[in-house]
Amino acid sequence: MADQDIRIRLEGKATEGDVTALRNWLERERPLEDLLRDGRVRIRERPATAHDGTPMGTSQEIVIAVTSAGATVVFQELLEQVRRGVRAWRDNRRAVEDGEPPQGRVEPVNRHDG
């Protein structure tokens, strides 16, 4: 599983601010916060790409990568934790801002596929 990442894409009318807000939210979610602090995972933003690696306009996505130090991280558990974190962020955004928050798609991706 060390060659798989977790990709998060916000769909619909998501803004760069939404992507950054979600990343900040995830960085404070337990146990992701602990895994980040211990260097077992990394979270980064990057331009969204299609399956063939070509850029998809100006949209951004978030990628969570398990590092070699985090090789013992159980990938499916991490994937479910990220999904719960995205749901919690959407619930919070709905409570503090007008309008429906963008949908989030969380999926595993092979590292070499982008």
Kindly give the residue locations of the regions a language model identified.
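Short, glycine/alanine-rich hydrophobic alpha-helices that insert into or span membranes
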Residues: 65-76
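Short amphipathic alpha-helical segments that predominantly mediate membrane engagement
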Residues: 1-64, 78-114
